[in-house]
């Protein structure tokens, strides 16, 4: 009888263990999903693929073994050195961040230096532009002065031309008077000497007017030379307008 009881108890235990309705695993798996810990990410298809106290659950579209206990440490993993490894990793990340920050500082300084260089170049270009503007103003001023000198010379030349014409008219009038005197002059005993004196006087006056006429022509030629010189200077100033300052 004792042997049959033992066999019956073992059969009952196996039947209960393999029953799909009741399982000892259901007693140890927590009902709150957030408390379940992924153990080694072992894939499974049923609870039997996992160890005791574990359940097969779908996480991120993958069936893995989970349970209410902390995961076992990996083989050959020194738990005491986990803190040191984390500290070393943090230290390396900190050094990398500091190196990256230093690199950014250097790039920032280089950019500031480049910006300062551009500012200096811009200031130099502005100064050159101002110098070109001053030179252009000076050339325009010289051109205006040349125009004024040319107009003054032309006015003086016109005045000399008027004086020359006036002298020529006066000379023609004296020539007419000379001819009239010569026509009226007749050899007479009492009037012959007087006529000769008047004739000499008229010739002297005519000669004086001829000298004044020659002087006026010389003065006109001098003003013509001055006008030509002013025209040449004005043309030189006009050529300066075409000068382009690099």
Swiss-Prot record:
Signal sequence extent: 1-20
Comp. bias intervals (Basic and acidic residues): 175-186
Protein name: 33kDa venom protein
Localisation: Secreted
Tissue expression summary: Expressed by the venom gland.
Biological classification of the source: Eukaryota, Metazoa, Ecdysozoa, Arthropoda, Hexapoda
Chain positions of Sequence repeats: 83-96, 97-110, 111-124, 125-138, 139-152, 153-166, 167-180, 181-187, 188-201, 202-215, 216-229, 230-243
Region (Disordered) location: 88-246
UniProtKB keywords: Repeat, Secreted, Signal
Bias type Polar residues, positions: 112-123, 217-228
Stretch list, region 12 X approximate tandem repeats of [AV][DE]X[VL]SGSX[DE]QX[KR]X[ST]: 83-243
A single cellular component GO annotation: extracellular region
